[in-house]
Every structure is written in structure tokens, then in C-alpha cells.
Regions:
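Short amphipathic alpha-helical segments
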Residues: 14-37, 72-75
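Generic structural motif
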Residues: 11-13, 94
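Short, well-ordered beta-strand segments in beta-rich or mixed alpha/beta enzyme
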Residues: 2-9, 39-68
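Absolute protein N-terminus
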Residues: 1-2, 94
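Generic detector of short, locally flexible boundary/turn motifs and exposed helical patches
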Residues: 3-8, 16-22, 30, 54-57, ...
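Glycine-rich beta-strand-turn "strand-cap" elements at beta-sheet edges
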Residues: 38-50, 76-94
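Short, flexible helix/strand-to-coil boundary loops that buttress conserved ligand/catalytic motifs
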Residues: 22, 67-68, 77-80
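Charged, amphipathic alpha-helical interaction segments
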Residues: 11, 69-72, 85
Length: 94
């Protein structure tokens, strides 16, 4: 299993807009329906709604790599450009 922790730092006021646009566009549902996706969940920091944490779990690194290449992830990258200043990713194979 592959576990990813992705910390997004948004522009002021952008954290909630980022997650809302991903949800409203259907991207979140599309990712969760992908082969090998165990979970894909966004959380907000208690201190700042502009700090967003994404926890992803995948059956295998190969399935997560296929996810990155999907059309809806290209759309997510466009949304990310509007709202996100910095992204930090940590991966662990369990």
C-alpha cells in the first residue's frame, strides 16, 4: 500500500475555494472511483483554512502513478494554479 500526505498552502482565502472547486467539478468523485484508490480525503488545519492536507491511500505505487496521468488530474492542476502557493508531498510504502 502507498500512503501520501500532501500539504497545500493556499493564497489567502483560497484553501476552501480550492477544495470546493475540486469537489464541485466532480474531480474528487472521479479520483475516488479510480482503480486502486483506497481513500482520498482533504482536511483543513485548525489554525488556518488556507492550509489543506490531502491524505491518499493506494493499493500500489503503479496505480497512484496511473492516477497522476489521468485527465481529471490535469484539470486539478489547473485549479491548483489558481489557489495554491506551495505543495509538500511525503510518501510511504506500507
Amino acid at each position: 500500500m502507498l500512503l501520501l500526505s500532501v500539504k497545500y498552502t493556499a493564497r489567502p482565502g483560497g484553501g476552501e475555494k480550492f477544495v470546493r472547486e475540486i469537489t464541485d467539478s466532480g474531480i474528487l468523485d472521479a479520483v475516488r472511483a479510480e482503480d486502486g484508490c483506497i481513500s482520498y480525503d482533504y482536511f483543513f488545519s485548525a489554525e488556518s483554512r488556507d492550509t489543506v492536507l490531502l491524505i491518499e491511500k493506494w493499493v500500489s505505487p503503479e496505480q497512484q502513478e496511473a492516477h497522476i496521468q489521468s485527465a481529471h488530474m490535469a484539470e486539478l492542476m489547473k485549479i491548483k494554479e489558481k489557489y495554491i502557493l506551495n505543495t509538500a508531498v511525503e510518501k510511504a510504502v506500507l
